[in-house]
Amino acid sequence: MRRIGAHVSIAGGIENAPMRAREIGATAFAMFTKNQRQWNAPPLTTQSIDAFKNNCAECGYHARHILPHDSYLINLGSPDPAKLERSRKAFTDEMQRVEALGLSLLNFHPGSHLNETGIDNCLNTIAESVNIALDNSSGVTAVLENTAGQGSNLGHTFEQLAAIIDQIEDKTRVGVCLDTCHLFAAGYDLRTSEAVEATFNEFDSIVSLSYLRGMHLNDAKLDLGSKRDRHESIGSGFIGNDGFAAIIQHPACDEIPLILETPNPDIWNREIEMLYQMEGDKR
């Protein structure tokens, strides 16, 4: 079965996220575990944790279908020692928050060298950062998200993702989330069934589909290889409906969270329904 949802708000408490996902007809969802614009956050209360778990059970959401995202402030490849240490502490805290919620995945952007160090050095730093977080948490998989190739952000090629994974000590606790807009912006074609098959095959040969833990389903506002992260509603961008039909029908997408981050939350319910229709609606 395909598990399709969106990145929902935690306003009013993290326990509200499952209910918001259910309201839009989602069978998976993503969320932040705290205010993503702040470094620090109070610990999750026992009441919020219990309510979150109860609401997930009531709405039928399993841990493997929930894809929390870490703060955008974190840079696990920072060339600045103080900022790197701050990022590592924040990322470890996010892993521990996910663990406390009874979840098993944490999605994150790899990191940026800020044009102050080499690519290989930054990839090594990112891997070391992930290893530190894994050593200080339990049962949570760190899920690398591919990037668009914008600026000095790393993770926009399958080779870079593979280089990070190669250095992770516990490979049972590392995975990948493929963002379709980022893939397309980085130069991986997704417009036809043939292109989708070729891109998945290339990922499998370089990284391995066994690491795929989720996807972000976003159309692209700009054309192939733009190196710019500009999301568009499904079917309204340069990837188009044919591309998303091929993606949603690909066997690699079975039973992993497929998360919308498209720009109009008011139509998420319609986009979810449209994607299910593309898949043949096997709910």
UniProtKB/Swiss-Prot annotation:
Binds 3 Zn(2+) ions. The keyword DNA damage applies. This is Probable endonuclease 4. The gene is nfo. The keyword Nucleotidyltransferase does not apply. NCBIfam families: nfo (TIGR00587), PRK01060.1-4 (NF002199). It comes from Prosthecochloris aestuarii (strain DSM 271 / SK 413). Zn(2+) 3 binds at H182, D229, H231. Pfam families: AP_endonuc_2 (PF01261). Belongs to the AP endonuclease 2 family. Zn(2+) 1 binds at H69, H109, E145. Endonuclease IV plays a role in DNA repair. It cleaves phosphodiester bonds at apurinic or apyrimidinic (AP) sites, generating a 3'-hydroxyl group and a 5'-terminal sugar phosphate. Coiled coil: none annotated. Zn(2+) 2 binds at E145, D179, H216, E261. HAMAP family: Nfo. Keywords: DNA damage, DNA repair, Endonuclease, Hydrolase, Metal-binding, Nuclease, Zinc. It comes from the Bacteria. InterPro entries: AP_endonuc_2, AP_endonuc_F2_Zn_BS, Xyl_isomerase-like_sf, Xyl_isomerase-like_TIM-brl. Its EC number is 3.1.21.2. Its cofactor is Zn(2+). One of its GO terms (molecular function) is DNA-(apurinic or apyrimidinic site) endonuclease activity. GO terms for biological process: base-excision repair. CDD domains: AP2Ec. It catalyses: Endonucleolytic cleavage to 5'-phosphooligonucleotide end-products.
